[in-house]
């Protein structure tokens, strides 16, 4: 059984027991969070597609960890002008473990 849900402006395809990295959520480590913006649920034979969301569909997950991703570098370079601008960014994320899918 798997589901597609929306969180942080992104869509994620998950199944039970899977660990997923999402955009940062305001929840403490160990908390249980519910996602109700479920776009699709499938159990092998039946496929339930929402318009836009599946009614009664929920994905439950447990917050495992918060952290920051790898650093990316942003460089703006102007040729022949002796001008260069460099900036770095590390995005916050929340790691969750999917504990249940309801359709």
From Swiss-Prot:
SUPFAM superfamilies from the UniProt entry: L21p-like
Q: Which GO terms describe its biological process?
A: translation
Q: Does the keyword Ribonucleoprotein apply?
A: yes
Name of the gene: rplU
A GO molecular-function term, please? structural constituent of ribosome
**What PROSITE patterns does the entry give?**
RIBOSOMAL_L21
Assembly: Part of the 50S ribosomal subunit. Contacts protein L20.
Gene Ontology cellular-component terms listed: cytoplasm; ribonucleoprotein complex; ribosome
Job of this protein:
This protein binds to 23S rRNA in the presence of protein L20.
What the record says about family reads:
Belongs to the bacterial ribosomal protein bL21 family.
Keyword annotations from UniProtKB, A to Z: Ribonucleoprotein, Ribosomal protein, RNA-binding, rRNA-binding
Protein name stated in the entry: Large ribosomal subunit protein bL21
